[in-house]
């Protein structure tokens, strides 16, 4: 029963990555009772964390926040610093999205406390997420410290993808602070590493970031080209959430109104199919703006 529930959990994680939320939820629901019966707190915490992510994508942030809190309690009780840091990061994201900046910063401060007391390289992914979040919250100095730290600490490691992710967040810092050339340098290097490593999801994520910098620098044609390339990769790998995201980006920057509308309508149908309510509402606003001709 123990190995069966671990397999169901893994199946759920893969299905969630593919944007097949109903099937993922079913797999997690199958895994949960045997995990509870066997007292496997690590598995239960992971399941709660994954279910919370699905709830958020469906637009139910309250339920997502509650599940992340429950997962956090379990991670703390079993002394899992990586799980706890991930939970705090996720909670910070939800609080930030709902406009509660102070509470979000409190959650991110908890991640900083974990990092201060544990220099494990396994915490670098959480530090990268933290750096991005602090940048978005306007905490540039704190963000720079974590971006540089994760960049330096991952430099000598075996994990080329992790180092590329750290480079991407450093690129984001330079983009936010107005140094587009340095930003592009880090993003381009990160992309080539991810291309060589054959990680389509990471490749798409960094392509989106690179597109953002090009867009902000007024290089619209190049940004469109990046988004289109990333869309092809997403479609080839059935990354449905990313397909929707890229269609929405293309709908935001395409030069003529008809193309914008086409991209946005396609993005809407992808998000509707996925049940991603929050993104659907945001794209509907973009459609409204495009219709009004702004």
Segment roles from a protein language model:
Residues 6-17, 42-57, 68, 82-97, ...:
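Conserved alpha-helical positions within TPR/SEL1-like repeat arrays
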Residues 1-28, 32-40, 268, 276-294:
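Flexible inter-repeat linkers and adjacent short helices
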Residues 122-239, 243:
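Eukaryotic tandem repeat interaction scaffolds
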Residues 19, 59, 79, 99, ...:
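Residue-level detector of the short coil/turn that links helix A to helix B
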Residues 225, 229-232, 236-294:
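C-terminal non-catalytic interaction modules
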Residues 29-40, 70-80, 109-119, 148-159, ...:
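Amphipathic alpha-helical segments of tetratricopeptide repeats
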């Amino acid at each position: 029963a123990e190995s069966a529930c671990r397999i169901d959990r893994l199946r759920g994680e893969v299905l969630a990555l593919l944007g097949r939320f109903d099937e993922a939820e079913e797999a997690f629901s199958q895994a949960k009772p045997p995990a509870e019966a066997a007292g496997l707190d690590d598995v239960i915490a992971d399941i709660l964390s994954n279910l919370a992510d699905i709830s958020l994508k469906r637009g139910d942030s309250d339920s997502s926040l509650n599940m992340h809190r429950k997962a956090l309690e379990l991670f703390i009780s079993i002394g899992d610093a990586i799980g706890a840091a991930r939970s705090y990061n996720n909670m910070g994201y939800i609080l930030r999205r709902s406009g509660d900046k102070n509470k979000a910063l409190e959650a991110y401060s908890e991640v900083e406390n974990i990092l201060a007391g544990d220099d494990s390289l396994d915490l670098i992914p959480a530090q990268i997420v933290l750096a991005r979040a602090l940048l978005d919250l306007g905490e540039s100095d704190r963000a720079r410290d974590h971006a540089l730290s994760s960049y330096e600490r991952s430099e000598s490691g075996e994990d080329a993808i992790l180092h590329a992710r750290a480079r991407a967040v450093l690129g984001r810092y330079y983009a936010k602070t107005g140094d587009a050339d340095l930003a592009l340098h880090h993003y381009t290097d990160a992309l080539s590493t991810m291309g060589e490593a054959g990680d389509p999801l990471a490749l798409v994520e960094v392509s989106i970031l690179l597109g953002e910098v090009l867009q902000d620098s007024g290089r619209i044609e190049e940004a469109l080209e990046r988004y289109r390339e990333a869309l092809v990769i997403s479609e080839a790998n059935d990354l449905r959430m990313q397909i929707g995201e890229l269609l929405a980006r293309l709908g935001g920057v395409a030069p003529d109104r008809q193309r914008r509308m086409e991209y946005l309508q396609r993005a809407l149908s992808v998000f509707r199919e996925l049940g991603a309510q929050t993104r659907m509402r945001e794209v509907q606003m973009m459609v409204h703006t495009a219709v009004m001709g702004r």
